[in-house]
């Protein structure tokens, strides 16, 4: 699971270079922290964190095409509940305390979302936009 970010990083970096030639680009990436530290600056990276429970239980709440595709595949399985439980276990592993701490202590700008029932999307976007110098 954890090596897939390393394997795909070269492709992601090449694509980012290509699409960012004449414009600013913001992406959700799986480029590993050690690679980001080598190729980027503090003001070009923002780490977004949330409690493990939020990242696991609310993973499919967003309308991202990739997430909805996965949900559709899981829903089509004969043993849907077991498959969903297994998938959530994998998410919990990926979003473990150890990995959370690695990102929290990465040295990059970090935004921590709280699972308090309040919609903070606009506030989070504003913080990130200010960090990237896109707004005052």
What kind of feature is each model-predicted range?
Residues 6, 23-24, 37, 67, ...:
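Context-gated lysine
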Residues 2-52:
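Glycine-rich phosphate-binding loop used to anchor ATP phosphates in small-molecule kinases
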Residues 3, 21, 64, 75, ...:
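Generic surface-pattern signal
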Residues 41, 45, 60, 130-136:
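C-terminal intrinsically disordered extensions
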């Amino acid at each position: 699971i954890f090596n897939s970010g390393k394997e795909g990083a070269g492709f992601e970096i090449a694509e980012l270079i290509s699409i960012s030639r004449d414009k600013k680009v913001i992406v959700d990436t799986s480029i590993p922290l050690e690679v980001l530290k080598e190729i980027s600056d503090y003001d070009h990276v923002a780490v977004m964190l949330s409690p493990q429970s939020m990242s696991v239980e609310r993973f499919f709440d967003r309308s991202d095409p990739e997430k909805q595709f996965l949900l559709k595949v899981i829903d089509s399985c004969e043993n849907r509940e077991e498959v969903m439980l297994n998938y959530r276990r994998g998410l919990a592993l990926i979003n473990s305390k150890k990995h959370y701490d690695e990102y929290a202590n990465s040295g990059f700008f970090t935004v921590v979302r709280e699972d308090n029932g309040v919609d903070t999307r606009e506030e989070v976007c504003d913080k990130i936009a200010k960090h990237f110098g896109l707004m005052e």
